[in-house]
């Protein structure tokens, strides 16, 4: 499991019965200096754009005052849909950061914009992001 491999606790639910002393989604939202959602689906973008907090990931993001990086990945038609583009604008206006999506071949066999950015592009973005900041005692939370 991820817990075994990383030797860190993993979180799955909004409320963990074993850690009732603190509210996990609030404490998690405070731990990281940058939160990355990878991949970010059209559905997830919709939840964030309307402030729907129904699971651990959405509650962490809505409770956070940290930088949030979204890495969209979806079918080209989903990406270009007016609702998705409206949600993109709303999230950009809220201050969310985006990498991609890129043009390329999709898992479904179609070609176009919607492919998740490559690990190299994401690494380059993160390196640039953190090169501009003092990294002493900083943490990154991946959702």
Task: Cite the ranges covered by each PLM segment.
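Cofactor-binding loop segments of dinucleotide-utilizing enzymes, especially the Rossmann-like FAD-
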Residues: 73
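A cross-family phosphate/adenosyl-ligand binding-site feature
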Residues: 1-68, 76-141
């Amino acid at each position: 499991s991820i817990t075994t491999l990383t030797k860190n606790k993993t979180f799955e639910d909004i409320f963990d019965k074993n850690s009732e002393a603190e509210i996990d989604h609030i404490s998690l939202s405070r731990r990281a200096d940058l939160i990355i959602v990878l991949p970010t689906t059209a559905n997830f973008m919709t939840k964030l754009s309307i402030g729907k907090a129904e699971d651990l990931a959405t509650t962490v993001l809505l409770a956070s005052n940290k930088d949030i990086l979204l890495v969209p990945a979806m079918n080209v038609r989903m990406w270009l849909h007016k609702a998705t583009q409206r949600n993109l604008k709303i999230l950009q206006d809220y201050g969310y950061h985006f990498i991609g999506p890129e043009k390329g071949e999709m898992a479904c066999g179609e070609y176009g914009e919607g492919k998740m950015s490559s690990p190299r592009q994401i690494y380059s973005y993160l390196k640039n992001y953190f090169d501009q900041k003092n990294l002493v005692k900083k943490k990154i939370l991946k959702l």
